[in-house]
Amino acid sequence: MRKNSIKNIRINEEVMRELSNIIRGEIKDPRINPMTSVVAVEVAPDLKTAKAYISVLGDKKSQADTLAGLKSAEGYIRRTLAKNINLRNTPAITFIIDQSIEYGVEMSKKIDEVTKNLKED
């Protein structure tokens, strides 16, 4: 299976949907911020590994705590994923903090600041 095949795209979407449900509804770890969302998932073509990009609303400490909580619940998440999705192999999940939303907000603020300065001149 190639990386961008239709089958792989469908698997990515299904894993992302299930991960969102598991994180939102089934994990009771207090370290995990309730405002955590799964932005994207990339499952390897051999279905052995997956990268889950998560976005956490909050400061850096909240992001670090959420990442630590998800890493400690990795085994539970993988077992639950195996029960809910019928795949040949259940991928080992690596959680990565997605900084793109923060970066976009920061760039938007900079653009607003520059346009404000141009209007004043």
Swiss-Prot record:
Compartments where located: Cytoplasm
Single GO BP term: maturation of SSU-rRNA
Underlying gene: rbfA
Protein's recorded name: Ribosome-binding factor A
PROSITE patterns per UniProt: RBFA (PS01319)
Assembly and interaction partners: Monomer. Binds 30S ribosomal subunits, but not 50S ribosomal subunits or 70S ribosomes.
The protein's role, per its UniProt record: One of several proteins that assist in the late maturation steps of the functional core of the 30S ribosomal subunit. Associates with free 30S ribosomal subunits (but not with 30S subunits that are part of 70S ribosomes or polysomes). Required for efficient processing of 16S rRNA. May interact with the 5'-terminal helix region of 16S rRNA.
Family: Belongs to the RbfA family.
